[in-house]
Amino acid sequence: MSSFSKEARQVHEALVKHGLENPFNMDPENGLLDAATRRSHIEKHITQIMELLNLDLRDDSLSKTPSRIASMYVDEIFLGLDYAHFPEITLIQNKMQVDEMITVHDISLSSTCEHHFASIDGKATVAYIPKDYIIGLSKINRVVQFFSQRPQVQERLTQQIILALQTLLATENVAVSIDATHYCVKARGICDRSSVTRTTSLRGLFKSSQNTRQEFLHIC
């Protein structure tokens, strides 16, 4: 059983309420198998897939591949499926009465397309206008990273980040923009090696105020 922090539970419940949570097969707090069991099952199935591809797992270059993939899935690229790994969030009272835009841009993100399990590489720009609280800047990067470490579609990823920050910061005034290269487009199918997909979500003043919106979009 995973153990959620209060902040993780609040974010998860907000995503469920708004229909933005990933399509989990069961409740992620009570239904998730422990990491060792998941690694064992995944390793077994990857072995079967490789054998169906006529690969000889006795070769020393391939023999540990199923184990490596299992560890990569559970402990690295899909770590965000387990809310036990939601970043620890420390809110700071806005004693300085900051009321201007705070922006973090060029946040590196790596995710995985849920349709083909191909890589997604991109950068995010996140901004918010504080009310009662501000948040450590690295926590914004960590929230982006957490939701990126899942099988994703970029549209949902953008909405998850913005709703998580709205929930944590208790403010509507949040904006998120992501530019990403999708290897399901670049390396297969159409094989377009230059296109970049942009998704943007604007809330609160970022949507209602033309000046605030233009300032954010200019940064992007």
Curated annotation (Swiss-Prot):
Record key words, sorted: GTP-binding, Hydrolase, Metal-binding, Nucleotide-binding, One-carbon metabolism, Zinc
Gene3D superfamilies for this protein: 1.10.286.10, 3.30.1130.10
Residues binding Zn(2+), per UniProt: 113, 116, 184
Keyword Transmembrane: no
Top enzyme class: hydrolase
Any one GO molecular function term: GTP binding
Domain of life: Bacteria
Transmembrane segments: none
Entry keyword annotation includes Hydrolase: yes
UniProt GO BP: one-carbon metabolic process; tetrahydrobiopterin biosynthetic process; tetrahydrofolate biosynthetic process
Reaction(s) this enzyme catalyzes, per UniProt: GTP + H2O = 7,8-dihydroneopterin 3'-triphosphate + formate + H(+)
Pathway given in the UniProt record: Cofactor biosynthesis; 7,8-dihydroneopterin triphosphate biosynthesis; 7,8-dihydroneopterin triphosphate from GTP: step 1/1
Pfam families: GTP_cyclohydroI
Subunit structure: Homomer.
Name used for this protein in its record: GTP cyclohydrolase 1
Organism encoding this protein: Hamiltonella defensa subsp. Acyrthosiphon pisum (strain 5AT)
Gene (UniProt): folE
